Design a protein with these regions (language model features):
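Alpha-helical transmembrane segments and their membrane-interface boundaries
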Residues: 1-98, 112-258, 263-344
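Intrinsically disordered, low-complexity glycine/charged-rich regulatory or linker segments
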Residues: 106-107
Length: 344
């Protein structure tokens, strides 16, 4: 919990001091990496991750730049990238898949600026690459401060294995779920392509985070929690932004970032024992990205109520579309349960 919260806070502060257009981006990448990896990445893994992030961002930029003035062509092209990302995620069978997550992140955010101007899209690609490097260093530093215990790593691996076993491996269902996720995210992205706004980044990253971490075996309860998670995340960011306006900039940024991150980190840890970890991670990403807008050296003229309303509307859309389009997967009974039931 402390590792995740301090990583998010340090990433916010470092991104702000580095003049990153969106300081919340480094923080969002750091928490996604920490939530996916029970151990610190090795040097080779870290280098590969940076290459993957930069490469996927470049691929999304190339597609968006090629078809920026032809939405009828751009839409299916982006749909293919989303399909590849979600397919990689589904085939991970409950295990973390950072390449899939990073491809989905890049496909969601890079085209929004690229369709406005190629130079803006190229800037986002460079920002993603530098944010990835900072996030990796922060992850290493946090693991040095808070080493991963053997028991915790074993528990995490067991939980992942149990979750993977709880979902039947059905290729047809997996393809259906992947297509459903593409159908959910594409309309949201098309909306922000038509109406570009700074809120596209927290909104789309939050949507991608939820769909990537969504657990088919949990059921609809996580949709109800999603509304609460995004609402809490946006309100917490609004409160933190208000404190940032009246207090010393850097101390206020660190304090409010830490308080908000601690709350969501505790929720994520608790969610690993019951439904809600995917939603808690989505809420944390929403909080970090919205708070990052307030801390950014670039001025984003987005009123606080508009931020909350926009995230709230996207949450309602996500809940409705997910309930309508995503099929439920029945958990596989534990090994030997059928025999015990027969004997009973």
């Amino acid at each position: 919990m402390l590792r995740l919260a301090f990583a998010a806070t340090l990433a916010l502060v470092w991104g702000t001091m580095a003049g990153e257009p969106l300081p919340g981006l480094t923080a969002a990448l750091a928490v996604q990496i920490l939530a996916s990896m029970p151990r610190p990445p090795r040097v080779g893994q870290a280098a590969a991750l940076v290459v993957v992030i930069s490469g996927t961002a470049a691929a999304a930029f190339a597609v968006a730049a090629a078809f920026a003035d032809r939405l009828l062509v751009l839409t299916p092209a982006l749909g293919v990238l989303f399909f590849v990302g979600f397919t990689m995620r589904e085939r991970a069978a409950g295990r973390p898949s950072l390449p899939a997550t990073m491809l989905l992140n890049a496909t969601a955010v890079v085209p929004v600026l690229t369709v406005q101007a190629n130079v803006l899209g190229a800037g986002v690609v460079a920002t993603l690459g530098s944010a990835a490097v900072r996030a990796i260093f922060i992850v290493w530093f946090m693991y040095a401060l808070f080493p991963a215990a053997e028991e915790a790593a074993a528990t995490s691996a067991s939980a992942v294995a149990a979750r993977a076993k709880g979902i039947p491996l059905n290729e047809h269902v997996g393809t259906t779920r992947t297509l459903a996720k593409v159908a959910i995210v594409l309309p949201a992205q098309l909306f922000y392509l038509a109406e570009p706004t700074a809120l596209a980044f927290p909104a789309l990253l939050g949507l991608i985070t939820f769909l990537s971490a969504e657990d088919a075996s949990v059921g609809r309860v996580q949709l109800t929690i999603l509304l609460l998670g995004n609402l809490v995340g946006s309100i917490a960011a609004a409160i933190a932004s208000a404190v940032l306006d009246v207090g010393p900039a850097l101390p206020a940024l660190a304090l409010m970032g830490l308080l908000g991150s601690l709350g969501f980190a505790r929720w994520i840890i608790a969610g690993r024992r019951r439904p809600g970890d995917a939603v808690a991670l989505t809420g944390l990403v929403t909080f970090l990205m919205l708070f990052g807008l307030a801390a950014s050296p670039t001025s984003f003229e987005v009123p606080v109520l508009d931020r909350i309303a926009d995230i709230g509307m996207l949450s309602l859309y996500t809940v409705g579309a997910t309930a309508l389009l995503l099929p439920l997967s029945e958990p596989r009974p534990p090994v030997g349960s059928a025999d015990r039931a027969a004997r009973a």
